[in-house]
């Protein structure tokens, strides 16, 4: 398997058949095919687009599903507009709701079938039931999402990154770059890189020091630096991260 999410599909009793092209997808379809599944973030980088998968599904009368767990649940939903039957989102990523919750949007008949497989019904998903507290918390998160000023939120994310950058901008050899992921975890991400010999710490050492401090600060690290994603930071977190990063980078 490639990653643990493959098992989330296999656990319902199906066999995964991986394809790369439209021809391979159509050739793999038979009377036992239960679902066509695609990872939304990677769809446009592959040879089968979301719209093409949806078209094939309708042609062969097979349900289609997009895993968009880390994406923004935008309205109107472009996956549903592309023709897929259902799309799933995490309740705990962009929505900032309970980590153990999620949303499935789409065809009412399919959603009803999913509902019948979970609590309060005694079916396959009974062990993974969401509590009533999680359901209401996710509903609140969705209501907050549609009311949120996303443009102002983005500016706040940029400000948080700037606070961190300003705190270490004078460290020898340090450089900064930013990028925005295409679909999943969409927010401005800042890469902070440096020459380990000049600073005296490798990226792995800096990441470990941040993680082992108080409070713990978790970052991604790569060969020459670390990365900061502000969209999971709470108000004031930047004022904790910035001095801690400076302390580590300037202490030998």
Regions found by a protein language model. Name each.
Residues 1-147, 165-169, 230, 244-247:
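Conserved PLP-enzyme active-site core in the AAT-like
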Residues 146-180:
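Conserved PLP-dependent catalytic core of the aminotransferase class-I/II
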Residues 167-247:
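Conserved C-terminal alpha-helix-loop-beta "cap" of PLP-dependent enzymes
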């Amino acid at each position: 398997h490639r990653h643990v999410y493959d098992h989330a599909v296999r656990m319902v009793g199906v066999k995964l058949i991986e394809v790369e092209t439209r021809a391979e997808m159509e050739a793999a379809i038979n009377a036992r095919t239960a679902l066509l599944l695609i990872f939304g973030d990677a769809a446009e980088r592959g040879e089968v687009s979301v719209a093409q998968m949806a078209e094939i599904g309708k042609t062969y009368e097979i349900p289609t599903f997009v895993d968009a767990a880390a994406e923004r649940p935008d309205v109107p939903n472009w996956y549903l507009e592309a023709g897929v039957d259902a799309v799933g989102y995490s309740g705990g990523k962009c929505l900032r709701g309970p980590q153990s919750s999620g949303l499935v949007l789409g065809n009412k008949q399919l959603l009803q079938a999913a509902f019948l497989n979970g609590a309060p019904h005694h079916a396959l998903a009974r062990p993974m039931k969401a509590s009533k507290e999680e359901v209401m918390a996710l509903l609140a998160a969705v209501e907050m999402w549609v009311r949120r000023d996303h443009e102002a939120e983005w500016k706040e994310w940029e400000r948080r990154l700037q606070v961190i950058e300003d705190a270490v901008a004078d460290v020898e050899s340090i450089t900064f770059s930013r990028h925005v992921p295409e679909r999943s975890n969409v927010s401005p991400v800042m890469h902070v890189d440096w020459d380990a010999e000049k600073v005296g710490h490798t990226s792995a050492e800096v990441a470990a020091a941040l993680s082992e401090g108080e409070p713990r600060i978790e970052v991604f690290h790569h060969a020459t630096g670390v990365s900061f994603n502000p969209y999971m930071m709470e108000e004031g977190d930047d004022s904790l991260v910035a001095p801690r990063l400076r302390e580590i980078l300037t202490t030998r």
